[in-house]
Each structure stands twice: as structure tokens, then as C-alpha cells.
Design a protein with these regions (language model features):
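Catalytic donor/gating beta->alpha subdomain of glycosyltransferases that bind UDP-sugars
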Residues: 55-114
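Membrane-embedded multi-pass helical conduit in multi-pass membrane proteins
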Residues: 123-202
Length: 212
């Protein structure tokens, strides 16, 4: 088993913003801990057979479950820097919403990343209303917290986009940066809607999961 890397191959300004917002750079990952998607993994047929192949009861997130099974059987994957797959990011918010809704639904079905999803619910359903209440009652304190939180929320995408839009005309660059919070919020809402649907499916199909 070996894992490679992937890079966005954008065709439009929107796709540059999308890729910068949702995809990590090579410098941001730890190769030994990286879990490749199906686009950037290579394995022998014997390894595939050893772990039972891709879980057919999953329509999304099946590659992560497959990764975990391979890692449990063979340990950390060798990382091949020169094996790079290029792909085009989603070109509109509708397609992006559907994609991340389905990813989160797959997480729920496979019981993946529960803490990560809980943090997201806490942020939007507890922390954000608290900050908005502060803005209503104590304007300066609320605005300070909102600005600090927004800075942390958008920091990494902004750092990526800064390099990816170097040399652009200022108006185009400003529009690209304005997309970051929109893309992040749309993706988070999609995940918060999709994850409980996956959990409900998992609860209703325990027999299917146990027999896999």
C-alpha cells in the first residue's frame, strides 16, 4: 500500500477560492498520518482482499473506512511525494453543498469523526449564539470575539489563497477572499445536516453493519 498526494486543478476564479478553502496543502499534512482518498492511493489486489475490499454498505466515506482497515493490517502507508493526482474543485455552491452533505452523511453511517462533528455543532449552536447575544447587549466585547473567531475560522484558507492568487488584479482578489467565509459556512451547514441523517441510517441498519 502507498499513498500519494492531490492538487486542485481549477478552471475558474471560484474554483481557485474553493480549492484554497477546502483543501490542505502538502506542508499542512503529516505524511505518516495522512489518510488518502481513492484518488491518491495505490494497493495490491492481495491487500484489498485481505481487508475485505471497500465497504459496500457505504456510499460515501468508504475510502476512509478502507484506509483504516489497511492501516490496521499493514501499519502506516509509505508516502510518495511525486505521485500527484490533479482534480477540479466544485464549481458552484450547490454542487459543493451536496458533496459535503454526502460526505457528512457517510461519516454518520460509518461513525467517523464524532468529536469533530460535535465541536462544529457546539460552535454554531452554542458559541455563535452567545457571541451574537454579546453583540446585542455589550457591543464591543461581542464584536471583538466575533472578529477573533472569524480570523481563526478563515486563517488557513486565507493563507493558501494569498499564494494562489498572487499577481491577480485587486478586484478579482478581493472577490476571491470574500468567498472564504461563504464557502466555509455553506460547507459547515451541509455537514451539520448530513451527519445526523447518517447516524439515523446507522441506527436503523445495525444488522447490515454487523455482518460486514
Amino acid at each position: 500500500v502507498a499513498s500519494g498526494w492531490f492538487e486542485p486543478d481549477p478552471y475558474t476564479d471560484f474554483e481557485v477560492g474553493m480549492g484554497s478553502t477546502v483543501l490542505p496543502t502538502r506542508r499542512e499534512i503529516v505524511p505518516e498520518q495522512f489518510l488518502p482518498s481513492s484518488r491518491s492511493v495505490a494497493f495490491l489486489k492481495t491487500a484489498w482482499e485481505e481487508v475485505g475490499g471497500y465497504p459496500e454498505w457505504l456510499d460515501y466515506s468508504e475510502d476512509l473506512v478502507f484506509d483504516f482497515a489497511l492501516r490496521e493490517r499493514y501499519g502506516d502507508f509509505p508516502f510518495v511525494d511525486t505521485a500527484v493526482a490533479y482534480f477540479r474543485p466544485r464549481g458552484d455552491l450547490t454542487g459543493y453543498f451536496k458533496q459535503y452533505y454526502r460526505y457528512a452523511r457517510g461519516d454518520g453511517k460509518a461513525n467517523l469523526w464524532p468529536k469533530r462533528h460535535l465541536v462544529r455543532y457546539f460552535t454554531y449552536l452554542v458559541a455563535l449564539p452567545y457571541v451574537l447575544r454579546l453583540i446585542w447587549r455589550e457591543k464591543w466585547a461581542g464584536w471583538v470575539l466575533l472578529l477573533l473567531g472569524s480570523g481563526v475560522y478563515c486563517q488557513k484558507p486565507a493563507q493558501r489563497l494569498w499564494g494562489n492568487t498572487w499577481g491577480w488584479r485587486p478586484p478579482s482578489r478581493v472577490r476571491a477572499f470574500a468567498l472564504i467565509p461563504i464557502i466555509r459556512v455553506v460547507g459547515d451547514v451541509a455537514k451539520m445536516l448530513g451527519y445526523p441523517v447518517g447516524l439515523l441510517w446507522r441506527w436503523r441498519h445495525q444488522d447490515v453493519i454487523r455482518h460486514r
